[in-house]
Amino acid sequence: MSEEYLQSDLARAIETHSIESVENLNKSETVFYICDVLGVEPPEAHPSEHNGTVPRSLSQEWAKILAEEAEENSEENNDESEEDN
């Protein structure tokens, strides 16, 4: 299967987890932000040359990271509410 470049997966992951730190970034900035967070080299072509899309593998990796963070936050919130009771 060839690697597809889809912005929608990344956008969906960001929306789903309400990541405030990237809400105001444009597509080009988002590509570089995600690459920086993941510790990978950004695409050689400037994001505007490929409509700000990122490889599916990057968006899937980002979604995985967001899910882990959401789970950690959920566990912390559960611990705090148990302490309150």
Swiss-Prot record:
Q: Where is the composition biased (Acidic residues)?
A: 68-85
Task: Please list where the region (Disordered) is annotated.
Answer: 44-85
* Comp. bias (Polar residues): 50-60
The name on file for this protein is Uncharacterized protein ORF29
